[in-house]
Every structure is written in structure tokens, then in C-alpha cells.
Amino acid sequence: MKKIKPKYFILDVDGVITDGQMIYDKYGKKYKVFGQDDHDSLKVIKKYIKVCFVSGDKVGFKISKKRVEDMGFEIKYLPVEIREKWLNKNFGLKNCIYMGDGIFDHLIMKKAYYSIAPMGALNHVCKSANYVTK
């Protein structure tokens, strides 16, 4: 039997490359807090697999887009209601490693080639993941 090699590493932005905080002022959402080491790690990984980001945060999408593009990657706004179907149609979930922490990410994780949840993800998401970071 031929072993399948994943072609894509798809990461959900909020809670994966951010600490989940969204900082507001009286005018609305202004800031998200991103980890500083993500860029270096993903720069190494992108030599071996295509790295892409998704976000369902419509209000904060410009913030996420700026950070992801500064790191040299692509990002797509995908609301959770259509994410699984869109990813399967455009990438084929069996070709994807998926990393997420959100309430509906477990649905994608169950169909992906391999799935990762960051430490602190929701319990049912961690149970669906092949690996939980430490």
C-alpha cells in the first residue's frame, strides 16, 4: 500500500499563532498577541510542505492578514460554517495536516491526514487531535 504524504499544513490563526487575546478599545478590536517564535519554526517547515493559514475572525482579519503576510504566508478568511467543505474541496483534507483549537475544529481534525491541537485547546478538540503541543 502506498503511503500518502501530506501536501499542506493548514493553521487556524486565533489560539494557534496567537495567545487567543483580542484587545479592544472603545472603537473596536485593535490588537491580537502573536507568538514571536512561530515565524522561525514555520520558515523551516515550509521547505517541506505548503503552509497556509485560515481565520474565521471577520473583525480582526486585517490584523491576522498583516502578521501572516509579514511571515511570508497566505491566509484565507473562512468562517467555521464553510471551512471544512472549502478545505476539502480546495486541498483535500486527506492531504492536510490541520492545527486548530476552536469549538468546531474537531470536525476538520477527524478528516485530516494528521491533526494538532495547541496546549490549552478545548478538551474535545484535544481528544480529536493526533497530537497536542506541550
Language model features: what each stretch is:
Residues 1-82:
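Alpha-helical substrate-recognition element adjacent to the catalytic core
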Residues 28-34, 70-74, 84-134:
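Mg2+-dependent phosphoryl-transfer enzymes with acidic/Ser/Thr/Gly-rich catalytic loops
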